[in-house]
């Protein structure tokens, strides 16, 4: 029974292997790959830039970052005032 099922499957697999790749799967030639390389690199750079900007904005909008930034600003202003009153 197993041989009865395995033999047609084996024939189909061998036929597919001998047929070769489909036209859509064929590898592009080297010159066309090199021509499209600058466009692909530019697209990759733009995508990377967008993701980096989004990540930076996300970090800027986090509550802990806002609180930390405010604390540093307040502390710096207090130090400036103390220096002004001390040396004025």
Swiss-Prot record:
GO terms for molecular function: fatty acid binding; lipase inhibitor activity; phospholipase inhibitor activity. Keywords: Lipid transport, Secreted, Signal, Transport, VLDL. GO terms for biological process: cholesterol efflux; cholesterol metabolic process; chylomicron remnant clearance; lipoprotein metabolic process; negative regulation of cholesterol transport; negative regulation of fatty acid biosynthetic process; negative regulation of lipid catabolic process; negative regulation of lipid metabolic process. Pfam families: ApoC-I. It is found in: Secreted. Disulfide bonds: none annotated. Residues 1-26 form the signal peptide. InterPro entries: ApoC-1_sf (IPR043081), ApoC-I (IPR006781). One of its GO terms (cellular component) is very-low-density lipoprotein particle. Inhibitor of lipoprotein binding to the low density lipoprotein (LDL) receptor, LDL receptor-related protein, and very low density lipoprotein (VLDL) receptor. Associates with high density lipoproteins (HDL) and the triacylglycerol-rich lipoproteins in the plasma and makes up about 10% of the protein of the VLDL and 2% of that of HDL. Appears to interfere directly with fatty acid uptake and is also the major plasma inhibitor of cholesteryl ester transfer protein (CETP). Binds free fatty acids and reduces their intracellular esterification. Belongs to the apolipoprotein C1 family. This is Apolipoprotein C-I. It comes from Rattus norvegicus (Rat).
């Amino acid at each position: 029974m197993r041989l009865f099922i395995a033999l047609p499957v084996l024939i189909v697999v061998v036929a597919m292997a001998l047929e070769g790749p489909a036209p859509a799967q064929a590898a592009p030639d080297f010159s066309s790959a090199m021509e499209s390389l600058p466009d692909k690199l530019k697209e990759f750079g733009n995508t990377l830039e967008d993701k980096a900007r989004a990540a930076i904005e996300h970090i800027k909008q986090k509550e802990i970052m806002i609180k930390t930034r405010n604390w540093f600003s307040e502390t710096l202003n207090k130090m400036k005032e103390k220096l002004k009153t001390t040396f004025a």
